[in-house]
Curated annotation (Swiss-Prot):
GO terms for biological process: dUMP biosynthetic process; dUTP biosynthetic process. It comes from Rhodospirillum centenum (strain ATCC 51521 / SW). DCTP binds at residues 107-112, 131-133, 152, 166, 176. It catalyses: dCTP + H2O + H(+) = dUTP + NH4(+). Catalyzes the deamination of dCTP to dUTP. NCBIfam families: dCTP_deam. The keyword Endoplasmic reticulum does not apply. This is dCTP deaminase. Pathway: Pyrimidine metabolism; dUMP biosynthesis; dUMP from dCTP (dUTP route): step 1/2. Homotrimer. The active site is at residue 133. GO terms for molecular function: dCTP deaminase activity; nucleotide binding.
Length: 184
């Protein structure tokens, strides 16, 4: 399962709409970098955040998730409380080819500050804004900057085409827009 280079990512983004909007070269000056890299794409976090709060002493249950556990914020700088997390989304909308699986890793700039980004793999033929889970593992509040780089996506091309894609299964997160909470 080879990792795909910048030339392939650029071609797929510009001719097939795999990443929209697509930033051709890495933007770095005065911001946390984003855009095309050698073997990946550094995505930006949008200015929409759902910040976890436990004012009602709730129990987190993925089968019966209570949306009131979050406070919605539209802001250029999100403050994530100590030992808490926030949900966000990418600025970019992704359309994954049928023979590709995409994995996501957090950027080292944030990891070195105790912020961890978690995203499940983007499956073949999935499309949408990527919902990002950002964990603040520190005992202090932490900042996340909207419209700057947060994570890097790596594109792995399969040796063949999968028999059943995410679209074929009519996956529950297909074509998601905005920050999407857990669904059953």
């Amino acid at each position: 399962m080879p990792i795909m280079p910048d030339t392939w990512i650029r071609e797929m983004a510009t001719t097939k709409g795999m990443i929209e909007p697509f930033t051709e070269a890495q933007k770095r000056e005065g911001v946390i970098s984003y855009g095309l890299s050698s073997y990946g794409y550094d995505a930006r976090v949008a200015d929409e955040f759902k910040i976890f709060t436990n004012v009602d002493n709730a129990i987190v249950d993925p089968k019966q998730f209570d949306a009131t556990s979050f406070v919605d914020r539209k802001t250029d700088v999100c403050i994530i409380p100590a030992n808490s997390f926030a949900l966000a989304r990418t600025v970019e909308y992704f359309r994954i080819p049928r023979d590709v699986l995409v994995i996501c890793l957090g950027k080292s700039t944030y990891a070195r500050c105790g912020l961890i980004v978690n995203v499940t793999p983007l499956e073949p033929e999935w499309e949408g804004h990527v919902t990002l889970e950002i964990s603040n593992t520190t005992p202090l509040p932490a900042k996340v900057y909207a419209n700057e780089g947060l994570c890097q996506f790596l594109f792995l091309k399969g040796e063949g085409t999968c028999e059943v894609s995410y679209a074929d299964r009519a996956g529950k997160y297909m074509r998601q827009r905005g920050v999407t909470l857990p669904r059953l």
